[in-house]
Amino acid sequence: MSADQEPVAFLAKQPWRPKQVTEDPDEEDEEDGDEGKNGFSLEEVLRLGGTKQDYLMLATLDENEEVVDGGKKGTIDDLQQGELESFIQNLNLAKYSKSLIEEDEPEKKENASKKEAKLLKVENKKQKATEGKKTSEKKVKNKTVAEQRPESCPVSKAKKDKQPDVFEFLERQTMLLRPGGKWYDMEYSGEYSLEPQPPDVVSKYKALAQKLYEHEVSLFKSKTNNQKGGSSTWMKAIVSSGTLADRMAAMILLIQDDAVHTLQFVETLMSLVKKKGSKQQCLMALDTFKELLITDLLPDSRKLRVFSQHPFHKLEEMSSGNKDSRDRRLILWYYEHQLKHLVAEFVQVLETLSHDSLVTTKTRALVAAHELLCDKPEEEKALLVQVINKLGDPQNRIATKASHLLEVLLRKHPNMKGVVCGEIERLLFRSNISPKAQYYAICFLNQMVLSHEESELANKLITLYFCFFRTCIKKKDIESKMLSAILTGVNRAYPYSQIGDDKVREQVDTLFKVLHVVNFNTSVQALMLLFQVMNSQQTISDRYYTALYRKMLDPGLTTCSKQAMFLNLIYKSLKADIMLRRVKAFVKRLLQVTCTQMPPFICGALYLVSEILKAKPDLRSQLDDHPESDEENFVDVGDDSDDEKFTDADKGTATDAVKEVESKETEPESSAEAEKPKAASWVHFDNLKGGKQIKTYDPFSRNPLFCGAENTTLWELKKLSEHFHPSVALFAKTILEGNCIQYSGDPLQDFTLMRFLDRFVYRNPKLHKGKENTDSVVMQPKRKHFMKNVRDLAVNSKEFLAKEESQIPVDEVFFYRYYKKVAVVKDKQKRSADEESIEDIDDEEFENMIDTFEDDNCFPPGKDDIDFASNMKKTKGAKADLEDSESSDGELGDLDDDEVSLGSMNDEDFEIDEDGGTFMDVSDDESEDAPEFADANPKANTKKSKRKSEDDFDFAGSFQGQKKKKKSFNDSSLFVSAEEFGHLLDENMGSKFDTIGMNAMANRDNASFKQLKWEAERDDWLHNRDVKSIIKKKKNFRKKMKAPQKPKRQRK
């Protein structure tokens, strides 16, 4: 190379930099100097046989800045594009470098300003450069660009080739998910995202997840098929060819073992539920599928998610590039998506079954929907709508069942009250809703238990109630049950609401108008609402007390079902009243009303009076004197005559009577008429002034303030103290004595006739429980029976009789005294029976007894055949205790005839009066000579006793009886004159058989003696009275006597 020729300049340093950077003039000058010194150029390399790549390699030997994707190009440690960057991002170093970044920002600004200055210099130098240099630089630049293009092309091609690999399906030889455990407890099942995902990405991942899941299931099947063992083989056989119940049980076991890989069995159960062939099969599969969802498939704390609700934009980041981890997530998410669709399909099937024609099918579907709603949050909105819709079912059983299930739901989940009320409100305002459905919905709402923290819900309910109240008034449907249910709901929701008084005042006048035309139960609800509204405002009006005073005389009080509520309302009203005169009038009328009521209501009213007297002691002045209203007072007029004038105690005093008589003489008739007492009506003008004074009691007054109740006494208590019911008499006497009634039970339930009859038959009454699994008991007062431990005992039990009489309730003293006497009698009878010794019969005695019946003549004539009393003969050696029997007879005499059973009666019970008795079989003259029978054994008919019952003939009694009193027995009454049966003697004259004994037979057809004898023997054989039968009985008896006997029963 000649010295005057300049070498070609080439910038090999950082060829990938931008154009403006590579054209730096300072660098060019430096490079030119270096190349000039070294004599190294591209042309030199080409001349020596090298290539362009050789030149680039040699030119970059001393450069340390040429790095491609984290490593030197062409070396072994060359990294893929972006791999180092992703690794650094995973280290999360960015959060630690915030302060460093802030410090580097001003330096970057300085560098940027320097670069701008350099660019200006470059532009100036370009103008001064020679044309040769420009041409050489352009060539070098063209070569460098050509060098850069082939390097950048493989990177972009690698990115394009790598993107389809994300959704590529790779088959594996092993399962990714291990069997066992709940699927929702696995590691990746709780990952979700609320952000919307790109639809195209979701569809691609879903297709990949489907392939992965199908491949996973196929691996599971091949694994189970290759298993060898008795249990697996038996399970396969049952699932394929067993009965319906066995198949479902086997499928449940398989699903419980591994739910993810056995989704096909879940689909099989779903198809059995949808099958329309057999109702029994459908219901069986329904219960099975429901239990499977509750116990194994559905999570407790969350709903199932669809496939698009998962974070696919972070999937690669969460899996850290691990395809196994990513595929596990995709399989679980796809399984959850499929399961959610199956559950939604099951809910639709429940909706279809709930409209079935059979009551059983509808009930089972309703119960299944309720259990899923209570236990799991999945599809709760659809299930709630189903249960609420059944409130309008045409059959009352289904509607009441739905109401009960909703109450159970609110007890388990109190936070759902607002949601349930909202759904019921939508049901009530439907256009095609039936009145019965509205009634059931209102009844459910008024049974809802509220609290003071739920004032908004109470306000909403009151607004709803008043809306339907106005509708009922417009329709003039005041006699319906709907109005009573609405008022009940308002009464229960008003204490918890914060609604304005204006809304309630709008309905007060309407309530007063409705009060007098509806039935008694509805009027009680209206009065309760009026009292709550007025009491909350401390403005209880006279109009309210007048309406309540009038309602006490309503005939419906006797038969209504809200007597307790009415008495409670009276008690609250009287306790809040400050007018003592009005309280006296209410107490007086209440005692008057009790005269026509049953004992339970009377006891409740007396208890109310006792509590009022305790709260207002000034009322005790009414108890000072107790004149009897039926008697009359004798008052002297003061005339010379001795005549007496009769005046009523309530109509006036003695001085008033004298004045009235004197006025008749002096004043004219017109003034006398003006003096007559007038019946008090509403509040008169004179009463307001205080000028009119009422001196007598007017029971027919409409206003309790001006009825004159303070001028009379509570004489009704005197009559009630003589009531036939012991509890009523006790309560009345307690009040008259000035004491308070101590009773903590419910008199309206404790003193009913049904409770008395339950105790009479030794059965404890049913406990009045509230609705099970509900909070309805919150609305009822606490029930504490007075002397509860005594009332729980049976009246004939030993524990009951062991109590003292003072510890027994008054209404059960009758049982106590009765069974006390019976227990004493039974105890003495047992003692006397134990003291009696029963002797065994010897063989000789039995032989003598048999000989009396065995005779050569089958028809033995004689008087002994008909001598019934001959059997009651005197025996020797018998043990008898006559004194004990006589003493027991005296103690039995204390009991009434109705209280003693026939088994405990003796001679004195059979004595005949002058007019005769029930057991009079002989004449009065001969009754004294009747034999005295022994006391009957109370256990004569038991298995252990050797005696027979009184109805059977006692053979052994003829030989071992007790000592009897020596009384002659005249048997003349057993025979009659021969004229009465003389015609029988005439007809049977000349026959050789008995015609006058107890075995006599008539022979009107003149049958032969042999014929009659054969018939007699046949009759004896049929009735086991022949000789062979008697001998057989004798042998059996001897065997029985030779057998070892049981020891005698010990005395108690």
UniProtKB/Swiss-Prot annotation:
The modification Phosphoserine is found at residues 629, 641, 837, 958, 972, 977. Its main location: nucleus. Residues 122-150, 644-677 have a biased composition (Basic and acidic residues). Ubiquitous. Keywords: Activator, Nucleus, Phosphoprotein, Transcription, Transcription regulation. Residues 23-34, 627-643, 883-932 have a biased composition (Acidic residues). Pfam families: CBF. SUPFAM superfamilies: ARM repeat. Transmembrane segments: none annotated. Stimulates transcription from the HSP70 promoter. Belongs to the CBF/MAK21 family. This is CCAAT/enhancer-binding protein zeta. It comes from Mus musculus (Mouse).
